[in-house]
Amino acid sequence: NLRRIGGFTDIPFLPIMGMDEPWRYRNKAQFPFGRNKNGEIVTGFYAGRTHDIIPQEDCLLGVEENKKILESIKEYMIENHVAPYEEETHQGLIRHALIRKGFKTGELMVCVIINGKKLPRSEKLVEKLCRFDGMTSISYSINTDKTNVILGKELVNLYGPGYITDYIGDVKYRISPLSFYQVNPVQTEKLYGTALEYAGLTGGEVVWDLYCGIGTISLFLAQKAKKVYGVEIVPQAIDDARENAKLNGLDNVEFFVGKAEEVLPEQYEKNKVYADVIVVDPPRKGCDEQCLNTIVTMAPKRVVYVSCDSATLARDLKMLCEKGYEVEKVRCCDMFGWTTHVETVCLLSKLHEAKHHVNVTLDMDEMDLTAAERR
């Protein structure tokens, strides 16, 4: 895609960051519930391009606890006559189960998504789930809409603080059911370490982190930068980001709620903020054009682009390179073993800052200065 869409023919690719252990690497899984042809409660995964559930209580990409947690939820449903959700009729209660685990802390989270306002006899579910070592947070999410979106807007906490914690490197993060947090923490540490390396921080820089989520990259950067500003559209993610900054004793980070393409121009035009480095980690649709234009206007020395979609990455790199930047290096990270998807991190530098540029030398003796003076 970088060649086909971006027109790049000579990109300096570095070796792919592969996975040492491509099994049991996912810290998050979401399982739909339903019934089979015999009317029995089943959970598993959707068949490709359908919403037909293939019964499967374990997956070698997920954590080992998933299987027994799902068995416990099914037991609770059967014993307490709680029906699974039926998409065709919009009847039934249990839609999905979300399970997360902190790889370094061992903390477990279970969030059950329901088609209703209340989970009956919820204490029975809590009792079953609390048998698992590391169970830290149990909640349910209310989602009564006819939608493919899994989580609802309202969360009800049943047990624990409503979140779990985990570490990437030596940075601690608070993770709620709604938090965006990379699903492969081992590879994430490699990815963010590379982004930090590309940022080239010496301690005196001002950095903007766009699409910052719960501050995962922001807090990595804050350890090496003078000041970091993070921007994220999801208010709860920013709440988590601010808590994460406090959790790590970092007071040189400031977070804004809003669209990157609106917050960045506003801060630049009204408050005259500047940036030595800008880091972007957008969703699959890539960066908004107005956001890219503001980046170009602010003219940071370096732009670090973290991407989960090579097509939109190619489009955005092409635009930045047409407006004064050059791709210095690109490196892919195998974040999703046994799939065709990778994360990519790119370093762009201002042309006059780039290592590769063209020098033009003019011989003053050969120039017609007389003509220039007459003008």
State the predicted function of each range.
Residues R121-F132, T136-R375:
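Rossmann-like S-adenosyl-L-methionine
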